[in-house]
Amino acid sequence: GKATERVARPMVGIKPVVMVPDEKARAYAESSAPAREEPDGPTLHATNEMRRFATPWSVAIARAKLLASTQLPPGLILDPACGSATQLVALCTLLNRPGLGVELSGAAAPLAAINLERSSIWSSGNWTETSRILWGDGTMAESILQTYHQSIGATTTVALLHIDPARPQNAQQHTLEEMQPRLDHLLASWAPFLSREPALILDLSPRLSDAQRMEVDDLVSSIWNDIPRTWQWMTQGRGRIDRLSLWVGPAADSESHRLARLL
């Protein structure tokens, strides 16, 4: 069907679909979310609303650079709530690893597929052949991996799980229950398919209270016990904290807390 028809159906509980960056998808991306060149980055599609809430390229690539010196296990970069895939393609580009992005929104999934294609041309890396975007429910881990492995004709492992769930635009509290997909559901779904000490980055609201951060800590501990972790606050200056994330397993460093300044 037409690209506009593809965006209408909800995908919760339905088998995921591989998004093909074909002419229909390109036409849909150009008409619904004109591409914009990122400073020192690729040209990416996103609607104005997506750009308001998405991770900027400068932040996405700064995060990826922090991982460059870590010893990640073999495998792919997984983002089960990838949006327009800015963070995913930054990680794939800098780490030269294939990526698997899953997006529930039928409006965003085609954009993610085109952005993956655009970034592969821009970076000229060798990570693109087995990179895919799936339209579907990011909590359906087994079905997602099955669809992905069928698509690439091989099986592979997950090197890094990056999670940045959508949060309500008008939320004041930014509680864990407001995240979509829910963090506890995502981690419980993917845990059986990860290594015993997986590398994770959980992108969270900087408005989380200490008690809410403890909730996230407890959630991680309930699955992976005393796995190493580092809480990271990121600032772009102006005297405020812009980003909060939890780096787990091989993604963590020797400190339990750190402040990253984006220059």
Regions found by a protein language model. Name each.
Residues P98-E103:
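Conserved SAM-binding motif I beta-strand of class I
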Residues G1-V7, H162-L263:
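Class I S-adenosyl-L-methionine
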Residues G1-L72, A107-A154:
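S-adenosyl-L-methionine
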Residues G75, A159, P198:
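Conserved acidic residues
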Residues P74-A81:
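Conserved class I S-adenosyl-L-methionine
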Residues S84-N96:
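Conserved SAM-binding loop of SAM-dependent methyltransferases across substrates and taxa
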Residues C82, G106, M140, R167-P168, ...:
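Short, glycine/acidic-enriched loop or turn micro-motifs at the edges of active sites
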